[in-house]
């Protein structure tokens, strides 16, 4: 067995919570979910795909392989880091979409989304996710580098 057999094609590191998608390719959960937030195609073959499914067999094999190579400490640290990133990403997306769905057809300023958020990491992630979602599910007016940019659900401007 080789390292490449247990590596994600997105992050090029050992799988963390590997998931398989419809075309048969496997990725780290964080990597594929982050990718699918902005593009619904497989990063390798570009086939359309649905929700990733956790691949517990590959996860077990990866953990065994990592343990046999005596690099499990670094692997588990990376796993904890990915889980934290995924939680942060999910929290940011919930804040964005909840706010925009409260008043369908209306827009909101990015500063309103982050105004009551105390956690600087979460604020940063909200701003990052807004930039990632523009063109996919969001439209904007103003400079995306500024907090006073106005965002709305894509194609909702005709409803105002």
UniProtKB/Swiss-Prot annotation:
Q: Name one GO molecular function term.
A: zinc ion binding
Asked if Hydrolase is a keyword of the record, the answer is no
Highest taxon, organism lineage: Eukaryota
Keywords assigned: Metal-binding, Zinc, Zinc-finger
* PROSITE patterns from the UniProt entry: ZF_RING_1, ZF_RING_2
A Pfam family per the record: zf-C3HC4
Zinc fingers, RING-type class? 8-46
Q: Which SUPFAM superfamilies match?
A: RING/U-box
What's this protein's name? Uncharacterized RING finger protein T02C1.1
Report the source organism: Caenorhabditis elegans
């Amino acid at each position: 067995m080789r390292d490449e057999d247990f590596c994600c094609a997105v992050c090029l590191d050992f799988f963390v919570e590997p998931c398989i998608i419809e075309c048969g390719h496997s990725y780290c959960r964080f990597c594929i979910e982050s990718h699918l937030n902005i593009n619904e195609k497989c990063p390798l073959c570009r086939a359309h795909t649905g929700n990733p499914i956790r691949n517990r067999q590959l996860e077990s094999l990866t953990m065994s392989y990592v343990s046999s190579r005596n690099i499990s400490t670094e692997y588990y640290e990376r796993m904890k880091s990915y889980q934290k990133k995924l939680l942060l990403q999910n929290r940011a997306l919930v804040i964005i979409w909840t706010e925009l769905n409260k008043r369908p057809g209306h827009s909101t300023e990015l500063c309103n989304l982050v105004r009551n958020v105390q956690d600087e990491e979460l604020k940063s992630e909200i701003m990052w996710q807004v930039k990632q979602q523009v063109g996919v599910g969001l439209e904007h007016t103003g400079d995306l580098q500024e907090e006073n940019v106005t965002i709305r659900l894509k194609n909702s401007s005709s409803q105002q």
